[in-house]
């Protein structure tokens, strides 16, 4: 999957993600400009397949919620993700009127349904207008399909963050 040079403006409603990645392999997202009413770029794990080998680079990801998010739907695993050379943070205008020029977090990693996030590298990013530049959450929120065993607490493994700058 190759997404290159797209513009997404989905701020009209509070629950609009910009780009969702669920159960995909060999993904490249580059040179994109996303502004969303919810998460700008979100990895989800509802699919039977794991998400693997993802590159996000040279993108502008702005949100009324989380600019870059893994979760909260994390029944699957996420491996080998590189995010580099991006600007992320809060949108200038929140149409809901609930927030002023700010996202909840720049990067949110929320493993709450038993999944694992591993080999995740973030480098050379700028975070603007975020209440929390990074938000990490490990939990078992008790989300179980009928007949399935209770999942364990989620796992973060080999997470690396380097060369992060703060903006306004």
Feature roles, as predicted:
Residues 1-168:
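Extracellular/periplasmic carbohydrate-active domains that bind, remodel
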């Amino acid at each position: 999957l190759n997404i290159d040079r797209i513009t997404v403006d989905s701020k009209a409603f509070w629950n609009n993600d910009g780009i969702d990645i669920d159960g995909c392999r060999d993904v490249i997202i580059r040179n994109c400009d996303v502004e969303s009413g919810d998460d700008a770029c979100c990895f989800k794990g509802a699919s039977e397949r794991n998400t693997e080998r993802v590159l996000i680079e040279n993108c502008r990801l702005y949100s009324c919620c989380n600019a870059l998010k893994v979760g909260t739907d994390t029944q699957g695993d996420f491996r080998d993700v590189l995010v580099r050379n991006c600007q992320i943070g809060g949108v200038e205008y929140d149409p809901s009127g609930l927030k002023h020029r700010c996202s909840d977090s720049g990067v949110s990693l929320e493993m709450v349904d038993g999944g694992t996030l591993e080999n995740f590298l973030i480098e050379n990013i700028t975070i603007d207008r975020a209440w929390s530049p990074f938000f990490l959450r490990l939990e078992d929120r008790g989300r179980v399909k009928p007949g399935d065993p209770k999942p364990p607490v989620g796992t973060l493994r080999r997470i690396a963050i380097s060369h992060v700058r703060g903006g306004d």
